[in-house]
Amino acid sequence: MSSLLCLVAHPDDETILCGGTLALLSARGVDVHVIALTRGEGGELGEPPLTDRENLGQVREREMVCAVGKLGGKSLTFLGYVDPTVGEGGELSAPAHDPAMLSGQIIASIKQTGAQVLLTHGSNGEYGHPAHKLMHAAALIAAASLGGAAPLVYSFAASYENHPYPRLSNADDPADVLVDVSNFIDQQLAAALCHVTQNALFVRRRSQEAGRPFTVREALLMEESFHRQWPSHITHDLFLDWVSKK
């Protein structure tokens, strides 16, 4: 049995950063398990607001259940950490946590799912989000603790020349694997539209940069990029086999 574990900080990260690859692998028979650090309680409420701050976590949980289903995910687990609200000046932060406990939860999830490959955030936290960096660090601590029993660890949003959205890529993580996900754009779009409270966020910056309204579909990547984080040297790359299989 082939099994992959995707670790993300917030609902919608799984769709925007690697949703096409999750859909592709699910279609190829890989069991895709998704774990979210938080329920995104600190995120946007929608434009116009679709809920209030008190209920946003529950709303976003339902949105993520919808999205993971559209991507063909086998399971979705929330670790239960609380996402801090964005500061008045736009400051982002990670949730309160115990590092050893978090890494222990990840180790337990790896063992429970039998994951052979783990996908998570990059070393720069994509656009520098502290919660993304936290998940990256915790995943590597878990892998180091497991040693030879650890899955391959890949980070998404790796950097490469002419990346269409360089702000979302990790400058310190050069791409080792590029995955053409254009055949799965409809599934990824369906998943993105599940995250209705965040749809305005998906297109806001790109609409401003383009000087015209962007659609959610236009904001999605047709090619997703990954950097191998663990181990540094391997003789056989199972993840590459999965994404390259015809």
Question: PLM features: what roles do these ranges have?
Answer:
Residues 1-113, 141-145, 242:
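Active-site rim/loop-helix segments in enzyme catalytic domains that contact anionic ligands
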Residues 2-5, 90-246:
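Metal-dependent de-N-acetylase/amidase catalytic core
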